Amino acid sequence: MSKKSTNIFTCSGAQHKWIQVVNIDGNIFSIYVCFFVCFFFYLEPSSDDESYEVLDLTEYARRHHWWNRLFGRNSGPLTEKYSVATQIVIGGVSGWCAGFLFQKVGKLAATAVGGGFLLLQIASHGGYIQIDWKRVEKDVNKAKRKIKKEANKTPEINTVIEKSTDFFKKNIVVSGGFVGGFLIGLAS
């Protein structure tokens, strides 16, 4: 891969340094990254007649991973890293997003399933679909037997429930914020 300096965005900073963002291939993602870098470092667009320092985004990205900024070097429990207010905000915002998406997707899924069922009923009533009720009953009984047989073989569910309960107990502040945000997201 050869670097091309496409001069998409040349910026000047507060310390009067000139920075040219180096782009690899000129795609739209790189343009957004260049704009983000200039915005993040409080840079303003400048003219091309000045000298500048070249900043290679690929090299910067290799050295500075986003998860190091988010989680730090030692990513321990949330209770050790953030204050209670920050934990509540993190839980509340993520819960609100999850609740809002759950509400929107739930409405869409319910509409799709209900509409499909309604269309099937109309088609059945109109004679377009003939249902073999004996075969349906046979398949339902077969499924019941399989469920009874598998009911005693589900220790995985118990371990998932135990792990979820332990996580809830260890991170009660974040969990409470998440539940509250989830309910607010469902209501909005």
UniProtKB/Swiss-Prot annotation:
Q: Name one GO biological process term.
A: autophagy of mitochondrion
Coiled coil regions in record: none
Q: Which UniProt keywords apply?
A: Autophagy, Membrane, Mitochondrion, Mitochondrion outer membrane, Transmembrane, Transmembrane helix
Q: What are the TM regions of this chain, as residue ranges?
A: 21-41, 82-102, 109-129, 167-187
Topology with regard to the membrane? Multi-pass membrane protein
Location (main, coarse): mitochondrion
Q: List the disulfide bonds.
A: none
GO CC entries: mitochondrial outer membrane
> Where found in the cell?
Mitochondrion outer membrane
**Span of the annotated motif YXXL:** 52-55
**What domain of life?**
Eukaryota
What Pfam families does its record include? FUN14
Under the heading InterPro entries, the entry gives:
FUN14
Family membership noted in the UniProt record: Belongs to the FUN14 family.
Q: Give the function comment from the record.
A: Acts as an activator of hypoxia-induced mitophagy, an important mechanism for mitochondrial quality control.
Q: What is this protein called?
A: FUN14 domain-containing protein 1B
Question: From what organism does this protein derive?
Answer: Xenopus laevis
